[in-house]
Amino acid sequence: LLKKRLESDQELNAKYRQAIDDDLQKGNIKKLPEQELSQANPRVWYLPHHLVLNPHKPGKVRYVRDAAARYQGTFLNDQLSSGPDLLNSLVGILMRFRQESIAMSADIEAIFNKVAVAKEKQTVLRFVWRRTPEEKVDVYQYVRHIFGAKCSPMF
């Protein structure tokens, strides 16, 4: 489905390639060499990916990794522990805002892409991709946490 869509729309194809190239340049993903692929590893998972277009941001293409996609009855998120709930309660946050005369808040851009995944755990975050139909399929691996996977002490 993704292949057909990208082959039929060259502009969309270029934007999708650019999104993956950006992740490669930022160090969020790495292309795996052949010798690393040939090593036996029982913990390997390949994530499907697809594109999402936001009607409110017409020039932006986002590629989404699907940690909830099933394969032979299971999916990656089934295997991850969500860990303890570390979020502060909204009531507590609002009460603390009222305690002082100045309040501050911040938003960290793409926070999941800032958290490194332990090297031995990265094999469950692989995906396949080829830039053009003429090229061979390459295997890539995330080295940073992906949005959509359960937060886990494993990462």
PLM features per residue range, with description:
Residues 126-139:
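Active-site-adjacent bridging/hinge elements
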Residues 73-106, 110, 114-117, 123:
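Active-site-proximal segment of RNA-dependent polymerases
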Residues 60-64, 68-71, 98-103, 109-112, ...:
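Conserved pre-motif C helix in the palm subdomain of viral-like polymerases
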Residues 25, 44-47, 56-61, 97-100, ...:
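Short, well-ordered loop/turn elements at secondary-structure boundaries
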Residues 12-16, 86, 152-155:
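Hydrophobic (often cysteine-bearing) scaffold residues that line and stabilize catalytic clefts
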